[in-house]
């Protein structure tokens, strides 16, 4: 069993809103697996939902470029958000983006290799670690992009439509964070898990009900889940009366793909013991 650390309990508490003891008990029962603990807490009715997107900890910037039916998005990480706002870091990000775009790179490894000297120079100057983490390249009849500050970036490709529509949809993706393009893209495994959680949460409600009624209840929950997870089924942020897929169709367009980056998603950042850090600094001044 994985060690149940204070950091793990804290993360589960932040992601579920439950008390510290409840979170610790759930982690112990789940053998230290935080995702299983969340599923168990949902199944027991302790929580209705939890954002299961992993730890978002690293700092840095997202950058995008769209030109001539092509789009590129990259993520460059720093240790602090302060550095991400500095001109030297911004210049490194832009130069990396432009190089990758102009060389039509589709993988991050060649960019990391070619930018290593510049990266080392930046690290030496700023005193923080800097890394080019990832990139994605897209091509399409219409390509749109949206950048929310420096922390969230989106690329969208359309068949038909125009750049303004693509940008609107990209903005929606940034705000709503869909998991997949359409319901057909949701895995059977994920649907089965959602069904299992629904049955456990509603065991009392469905007890004694006819099988066809239970099936309709399950179908309703799954349809709701698919709508929440799928871009084309989500209510458009600018007009919730219209689904994103219908918005595209009305404009004579079809959404082909989307890519959404958020700074640091899935990267675990080391916990800082500020009390120990201050104590160490005080001790150092007394030497």
UniProtKB/Swiss-Prot annotation:
The keyword tRNA processing does not apply. Residues 80-83 are annotated as: Involved in Mg(2+) ion dislocation from EF-Tu. Associates with the EF-Tu.GDP complex and induces the exchange of GDP to GTP. It remains bound to the aminoacyl-tRNA.EF-Tu.GTP complex up to the GTP hydrolysis stage on the ribosome. The lineage of its organism: Bacteria, Pseudomonadati, Pseudomonadota, Gammaproteobacteria, Pseudomonadales. It comes from the Bacteria. Belongs to the EF-Ts family. It is found in: Cytoplasm. Its main location: cytoplasm. Keywords: Cytoplasm, Elongation factor, Protein biosynthesis. It comes from Stutzerimonas stutzeri (strain A1501). It holds the Pfam family EF_TS. SUPFAM superfamilies: Elongation factor Ts (EF-Ts), dimerisation domain, UBA-like. This is Elongation factor Ts. One of its GO terms (molecular function) is translation elongation factor activity. GO terms for cellular component: cytoplasm.
